[in-house]
């Protein structure tokens, strides 16, 4: 990786319960607040890998190599924006250093379909809807659905969470 970021991990082992996934978000929120952050200073973004899997079915994308390349491209949307991601979903992209990254070689119409579907911001999977219901039961509201939260690694298979600070970090 060419960028630096801080992260920590917490996992439940031995359960596939969506209750556990929802509780992780609540736990993250509680930890951040104990560290002195106010709810207004961060947001937990959620998505589901199943959304992209359904999308790949919709455009008849069967090649595992193309899927992985497309996921890695979509994972860069926060850094490259849609223009850069479109290039990576297509033939490829040359970055500022001059390095060329081969793209997923998707057709222009498939790239447009992906962009349109992900910009709808409508939770379409059962798992995500269940997590949203659990959040409501917990009166937990410090989250937003963001379909651009996608991980380019194969072991991500379901709900995905990411915490973003709403202020610039100095030092």
Predicted regions and their residues:
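Extended, charged alpha-beta segments that form solvent-exposed binding/catalytic grooves
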Residues: 1-143, 147-155, 162-170
């Amino acid at each position: 990786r060419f960028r630096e970021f801080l992260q920590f991990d917490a996992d439940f082992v031995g359960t596939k319960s969506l209750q556990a996934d929802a509780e992780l978000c609540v736990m993250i929120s509680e930890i951040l607040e104990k560290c002195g952050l106010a709810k207004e200073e961060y947001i937990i973004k959620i998505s589901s890998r199943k959304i992209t899997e359904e999308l790949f079915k919709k455009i008849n994308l069967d090649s595992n190599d193309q899927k992985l390349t497309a996921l890695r491209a979509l994972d860069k949307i926060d850094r490259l924006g849609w223009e850069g991601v479109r290039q990576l979903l297509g033939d490829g992209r040359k970055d500022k250093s001059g390095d060329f990254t081969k793209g997923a070689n998707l057709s222009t119409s498939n790239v447009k379909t992906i962009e349109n579907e992900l910009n709808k911001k409508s939770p379409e999977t059962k798992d995500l809807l269940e997590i949203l219901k659990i959040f409501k039961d917990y009166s937990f509201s410090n989250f937003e659905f963001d379909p651009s939260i996608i991980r380019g690694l194969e072991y991500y298979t379901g709900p995905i969470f990411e915490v973003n600070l709403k202020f610039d970090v100095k030092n």
